[in-house]
């Protein structure tokens, strides 16, 4: 009996080393000590049966605490289920290990339900991120087409400004809605070329009424108000980009007050990320660009060095935007791959090396190594008994 107590003491000590000190799992493991001792005393094979129901239950409870690095990581629903299962064992165990097995089965069923919910939630966030990615791709393609026109035709400066702001929205949404191979996209490209041709003519020549109508219609289709669309259309269909109705200042003010398509303040972040990377940051950058989706990270969240665990759910090879979720599939952060690499190089983020073996097995093998060391024997690998 004394040997059993000693072994359990060592086993518990090893398990608790892998669980955060203030994690709820610590209290749950403590509550389980009495029924676990009783089960170990009743079964001579307790320490050698890998799939022993008590060890299975201990592993489930301990592993829940090993991944919760802070209060934000804890899952209230799972914590409630774990607490209920432990209370049931404490109250109902009278020597039948089936009580542990039933409690563990109940928890595992709950875990599978949570995993499905997390998968659905995560998929929703990934779909939204991919939608932003498609929008960004369309914006870049539209901007490239406009820059090509401005370089080749050199329309008046204010016309170029209108093209880059208002007409860019038209091209972007056409690409998103209809696609690059669509007749609508071909029509918009033809209109773009026509705008360049007409506005480059010398002032005083007649307005292209048909072009103005087409431009105004296109702007209305992407959400511009009638007066804005009409004012922009007049300038984009008149030689020299002139308009006697609405002044440049008035139109520029209206456009400045209007939210740009897909503009969420990302430009400043991109400019900041353009700072050259150090060799260490570049090495980390190359590493993160090759990581598979689903890789776990730990981020330092304060000056005390507290950590938060987040999973790299998805990233864009084109823009470098990366989406992070927690265990429940909830979006908890966004980083660019560039900023992520800088955090890693600065010691503020690190990859989590996931253990292949179960926590209970690692704890048991560590216990065995401790016993062998105390007995003056050579340590053995985890694969050995």
Describe each region flagged by the PLM.
Residues 1-385:
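Extended, low-complexity, amphipathic alpha-helical coiled-coil/linker regions that act as scaffolds
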């Amino acid at each position: 009996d004394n040997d059993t107590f000693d072994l359990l003491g060592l086993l518990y000590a090893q398990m608790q080393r892998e669980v955060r000190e203030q994690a709820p799992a610590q209290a749950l493991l403590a509550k389980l000590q009495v029924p676990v001792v009783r089960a170990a005393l009743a079964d001579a094979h307790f320490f050698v049966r890998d799939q022993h129901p008590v060890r299975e239950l201990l592993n489930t409870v301990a592993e829940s605490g090993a991944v919760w690095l802070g209060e934000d990581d804890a899952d209230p629903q799972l914590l409630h289920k774990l607490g209920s299962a432990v209370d049931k064992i404490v109250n109902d165990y009278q020597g039948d290990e089936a009580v542990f097995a039933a409690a563990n089965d109940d928890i595992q069923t709950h875990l599978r339900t949570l995993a499905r919910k997390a998968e659905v939630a995560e998929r929703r966030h990934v779909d939204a991120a991919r939608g932003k990615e498609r929008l960004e791709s369309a914006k870049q393609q539209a901007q490239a087409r406009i820059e090509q026109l401005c370089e080749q035709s050199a329309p008046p400066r204010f016309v170029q400004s209108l093209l880059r702001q208002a007409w860019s929205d038209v091209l972007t949404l056409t690409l998103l809605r209809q696609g690059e191979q669509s007749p609508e996209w071909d029509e918009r490209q033809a209109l773009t070329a026509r705008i360049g041709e007409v506005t480059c003519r010398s002032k005083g020549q007649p307005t292209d009424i048909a072009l103005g109508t087409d431009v105004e219609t296109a702007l209305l289709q992407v959400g511009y108000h009638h007066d804005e669309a009409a004012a922009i259309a007049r300038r984009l269909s008149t030689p020299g980009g002139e308009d006697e109705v609405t002044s440049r200042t008035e139109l520029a003010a209206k456009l400045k007050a209007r939210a740009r398509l897909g503009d969420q303040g990302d430009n400043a972040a991109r400019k900041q990320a353009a700072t050259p990377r150090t060799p260490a940051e570049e090495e980390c950058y190359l590493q993160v660009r090759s990581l598979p989706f689903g890789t776990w990270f730990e981020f330092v969240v304060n000056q005390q060095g507290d950590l938060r665990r987040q999973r790299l759910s998805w990233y864009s090879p084109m823009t470098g935007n990366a989406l992070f979720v927690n265990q429940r599939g909830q979006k908890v952060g966004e980083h660019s791959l560039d900023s992520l690499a800088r955090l890693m190089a600065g010691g503020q983020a690190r990859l989590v090396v996931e253990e292949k073996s179960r926590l209970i097995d690692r704890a048991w093998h560590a216990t065995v190594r401790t016993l062998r060391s105390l007995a003056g024997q050579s340590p053995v690998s985890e694969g050995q008994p």
